[in-house]
């Protein structure tokens, strides 16, 4: 199992990752950073997310998670010491107990409804700030990196 299991997500200010599950996410401004950070590492995602991002994933091992797949079994098959969990909300929730880091990039949008970062209830966890990366200075967009301390 990887020593670093990183949730990576662009979110709106009200905590949504998309307006609906099949949205082609054109509103995010962090795609170049996503590509840089995930290059050479396995990226785990659900099939809807894969459908919306497939053109952006060249050069990466992509693991598509299906409804009945066991997150622990998937992670045990990963040979790399680092992998990224790239959505959607159901996948983030299912892999939540295994996360070691959160890379969250808030964007200046409010959707009001849509796909939440975690579609299911997750347990409380303490997160510790580790790093801040500038994504788009003109729009005030930064990626916040946290270490997760599961309770």
Tell me what each language-model feature is:
Residues 1-151:
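Enzymes that bind and transform nitrogen-containing heteroaromatic metabolites
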